[in-house]
Amino acid sequence: MNSRPTWIQVEFIRGSRTFVNLCWACILVCGATGFLLVGFSSCIGKDLIPILSSKQIAFIPQGLVMCFYGIAGLFLGLYLCCTVFWNVGSGYNYFDKREGISSIFRWGFPGKNRRIHIRLILGDIEAVGLRSQEGLFPSRILYLKVRGRQSIPLTRIGENSTPEYMEEKAAELARFLRISIEGF
């Protein structure tokens, strides 16, 4: 039994809290820690990692560069861990035909703009757009074309969906809102 009214459509958007992002964060932190420890080992002359000998690595320039890469990797890993923890990019797209409003909500980074909330009047939405780019890194973005505003993306930028799925999503939303579809 579907208890959702026919005049409301809600789509939840997955953010950056994915298994792949968590794996990359762990790999980055572990690799960067190894680089930092080997670089620091070459500085003090003792092996901090027993299975890796730092006797063949001179501190200047190899050890210094490894320390730099280790610190940079730790910052990138920490950044990725924070985006996973805060679930940046998650949210919802809400369309209500009875009230005549649309609400697009996303979580951002902590601060005064943590909550990104865009409210629109359904009458201002001109079309549903589907921007497709093929090639080595294909991308398909579903967006709303709004009168007097920039286009508002509805899907994640890194979302890798099939053309058929995205076309079906665009057609479903256009049918629900009774507006046209544009493509690029």
Swiss-Prot record:
Q: Where in the cell is it found?
A: Plastid, Chloroplast thylakoid membrane
The annotated topology with respect to the bilayer is: Multi-pass membrane protein
Q: Record's Pfam families?
A: Ycf4
Q: Name one GO cellular component term.
A: photosystem I
Q: Which domain of life is it from?
A: Eukaryota
Q: Which UniProt keywords apply?
A: Chloroplast, Membrane, Photosynthesis, Plastid, Thylakoid, Transmembrane, Transmembrane helix
Where is the major localization of this protein?
plastid
Membrane-traversing stretches:
20-42, 57-79
List GO BP terms, alphabetically: photosynthesis
Task: Explain the purpose of this protein.
Answer: Seems to be required for the assembly of the photosystem I complex.
Similarity field: Belongs to the Ycf4 family.
Full protein name: Photosystem I assembly protein Ycf4
Naturally occurring in which organism (per UniProt): Adiantum capillus-veneris (Maidenhair fern)
